[in-house]
C-alpha cells in the first residue's frame, strides 16, 4: 500500500531552526594521519531539544541528550576525483523507542501523537504505545536527515534544493517506529519551520509499505530458517567461542546485577533468549534517560553489545539463513540498483532511495555481504548506504541495449558506507577498484544471496535436519 504523509505537518516544540540550512556547518578536519574533509552537525543541534520536552518524573536527572553515533560525514568518500555519484540507497534503523513489552509502564517514556511528529508544548503529551518512537527518537532521525541535507544538497548538489518526489523513493516496514523514522528523516532532509500554518502544506511524500505477508525487510519465519536459527546455539563453533569468552560467567554477572537491584529501577530482565533482545530492551531505558540498575558499567555494556553482534554474525555459519532471511530484500535493492545502472526509463530521475527498517535489517545485510566489520549491535538511527558511482570520463551510450549494457556496467562501482564509515564487501575485497566493488561483481555477489525459489528453499526434510545436526554439532 502507499501511505501519504505531509512533509510539513508537525507543530514545533523541538524547535529546529526554521531555516534547515543554518543548523549545519562545514568542518574540515585536517588530521596528520587522515587528511579528510568531513561535515559535522553543530553540537548545539544535537542538544537543542529542551529538557522539558523529553524529561519527566521518571527520567534520570543527570541524563543529557547526545547523539548515539558520530555525525561526521567524510565528504571525500562521496565525491572521489575520477567518479560521479549516480545513485544512493540508504537503509536506516529507526530512532529511540519504547519497549515492546507490557512489563513496563509506558508512562515512563515521553512520546508525541502518532499523527504529529512533534507536539505543541502547550498540549499535554499522549501516552506512549509499545514500540513507539520517543521524542528523542524523532530528533535522532531529524538530525540524520539534516546531515544528509548538508551532504547531498548543500555540498554535492546531488539532490534538488526543493523536494522533488521523482528524485526520492521511500519505503518503510509497517511499524509505527519505522514509519515515524522515515517521516522524521524527511523532515530533516526537506522540512521547514514546523509551524502551525504549514500543517496542511501540499508537499508530501509517498511511502511504500508492503502488506505484512509480503514484507521482507527483516528475516521472516520459515521452517528451514527457524530450524537453522535454533541450531546456531548448538553449533560447535558457537559453543567453542562462548566457552573461550566465558559467556556463561558473564551472563551470570548480569543476572546478579538484576537480582541485586531489581527494586531500585523498573528495568528488570530475569532471563532473555538472546543478547540482541536484551540490548534492545536495555537501550529503551538508557537511550531515553531512564535509570538503570547499579552494575551496568561501560565495560559490561560494551560486552553486551559485542555478544549481540556475535549472535548476528553467527548466521554466517549457515549461508542459507542470509538467503532465506534477507535475500528477497536484497533482490529488491539489487533490481533497483541494476535498473538505475542501465538508465532504465522507470528510474530516470530517481537519485535516492530510503528504506526505513530495523536492527535486524542492517545486521542481516552486513552479514549477508560479509561486511560486518564492527563488533557492535547496530545502534538506533544507524544508516547503511550503497553508493553507485560511474567513471567520470566515460561517455555512456545514448541508448542502452543488450549489446552495450555490459560495457556500461563495467564503468560503474558500488561503495558501501555504514554510519559514515566506509566498509568493504568480503567477497569483493580482492577485486576492489579505489576502495569500491565493481558493479558487475556486486551484482554477482548479490545474486548469490537471492533465493531462486523462496517457498521451496524454505522447506526442510527430516533427512536435511539430521545432516545439519551431524555437520554442525
From Swiss-Prot:
Pfam (any one): His_Phos_2
Organism of this sequence: Dictyostelium discoideum (Social amoeba)
EC numbers, comma separated: 3.1.3.2
Active site: residue positions: 94 (nucleophile), 359 (proton donor)
Catalyzed chemical reaction(s): a phosphate monoester + H2O = an alcohol + phosphate
Keywords per UniProt: Hydrolase
Family classification: Belongs to the histidine acid phosphatase family.
EC top class, as a word: hydrolase
Molecular function in Gene Ontology: acid phosphatase activity; phosphatase activity
UniProt keyword Heme present: no
Alphabetized InterPro entries for the sequence: Acid_Pase_AS (IPR033379), His_Pase_clade-2 (IPR000560), His_PPase_superfam (IPR029033), Histidine_acid_phosphatase (IPR050645)
Listed name of the protein: Probable acid phosphatase DDB_G0284755
Stored Gene3D superfamilies: Phosphoglycerate mutase-like (3.40.50.1240)
Phylogenetic lineage: Eukaryota, Amoebozoa, Evosea, Eumycetozoa, Dictyostelia
Amino acid at each position: 500500500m502507499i501511505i501519504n504523509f505531509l512533509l510539513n505537518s508537525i507543530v514545533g516544540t523541538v524547535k529546529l531552526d526554521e531555516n534547515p540550512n543554518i543548523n549545519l556547518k562545514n568542518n574540515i578536519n585536517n588530521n596528520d594521519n587522515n587528511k579528510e574533509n568531513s561535515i559535522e552537525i553543530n553540537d548545539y543541534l544535537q542538544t537543542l531539544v529542551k529538557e522539558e520536552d523529553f524529561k519527566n518524573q521518571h527520567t534520570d536527572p543527570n541524563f543529557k541528550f547526545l547523539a548515539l553515533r558520530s555525525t561526521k560525514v567524510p565528504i571525500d568518500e562521496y565525491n572521489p576525483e575520477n567518479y560521479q555519484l549516480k545513485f544512493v540507497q540508504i537503509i536506516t534503523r529507526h530512532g529511540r523507542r519504547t519497549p515492546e513489552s507490557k512489563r513496563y509502564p509506558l508512562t515512563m517514556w515521553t512520546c508525541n501523537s502518532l499523527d504529529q511528529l512533534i507536539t505543541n508544548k502547550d498540549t499535554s503529551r499522549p501516552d506512549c504505545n509499545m514500540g513507539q518512537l520517543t521524542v528523542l527518537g524523532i530528533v535522532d532521525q531529524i538530525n540524520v536527515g539534516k546531515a544528509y541535507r548538508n551532504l547531498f544538497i548543500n555540498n554535492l548538489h546531488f539532490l534538488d534544493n526543493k523536494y522533488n518526489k521523482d528524485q526520492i523513493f521511500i519505503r518503510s516496514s509497517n511499524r509505527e517506529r519505522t514509519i515515524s523514522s522515515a517521516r522524521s528523516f524527511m523532515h530533516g532532509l526537506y522540512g521547514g519551520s514546523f509551524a502551525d500554518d504549514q500543517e496542511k502544506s501540499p508537499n508530501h511524500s509517498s511511502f511504500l509499505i508492503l502488506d505484512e505477508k509480503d514484507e521482507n525487510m527483516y528475516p521472516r519465519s520459515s521452517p528451514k530458517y527457524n530450524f537453522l536459527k535454533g541450531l546456531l546455539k548448538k553449533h560447535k563453533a558457537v559453543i567453542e567461542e562462548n566457552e573461550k569468552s566465558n559467556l556463561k560467567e558473564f551472563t551470570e554477572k548480569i543476572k546478579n546485577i538484576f537480582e541485586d537491584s531489581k527494586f531500585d529501577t523498573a528495568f528488570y530482565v530475569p532471563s532473555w533468549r538472546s543478547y540482541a533482545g536484551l540490548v534492545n530492551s536495555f537501550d529503551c531505558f538508557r537511550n531515553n534517560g531512564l535509570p538503570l540498575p547499579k552494575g551496568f558499567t561501560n565495560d559490561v555494556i560494551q560486552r553486551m553489545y559485542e555478544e549481540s553482534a556475535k549472535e548476528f554474525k553467527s548466521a554466517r555459519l549457515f549461508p542459507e539463513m542470509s538467503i532465506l532471511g534477507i535475500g528477497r530484500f536484497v533482490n529488491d535493492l539489487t533490481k533497483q540498483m541494476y535498473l538505475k545502472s542501465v538508465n532504465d526509463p522507470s528510474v530516470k530521475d530517481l537519485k535516492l532511495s530510503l528504506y526505513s527498517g530495523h536492527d535486524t535489517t542492517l545486521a542481516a545485510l552486513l552479514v549477508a555481504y560479509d561486511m560486518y566489520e564492527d563488533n557492535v549491535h547496530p545502534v538506533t538511527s544507524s544508516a547503511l548506504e550503497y553508493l553507485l558511482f560511474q567513471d567520470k570520463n566515460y561517455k555512456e551510450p545514448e541508448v542502452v541495449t543488450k549489446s552495450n549494457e555490459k560495457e556500461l556496467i563495467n564503468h560503474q562501482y558500488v561503495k558501501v558506507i555504514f554510519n559514515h564509515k566506509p566498509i568493504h564487501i568480503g567477497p569483493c575485497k580482492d577485486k576492489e577498484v579505489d576502495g569500491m566493488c565493481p558493479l558487475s561483481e556486486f551484482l554477482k555477489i548479490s545474486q548469490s544471496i537471492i533465493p531462486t525459489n523462496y517457498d521451496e528453499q524454505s522447506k526442510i526434510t527430516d533427512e536435511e535436519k539430521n545432516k545439519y545436526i551431524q555437520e554442525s554439532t
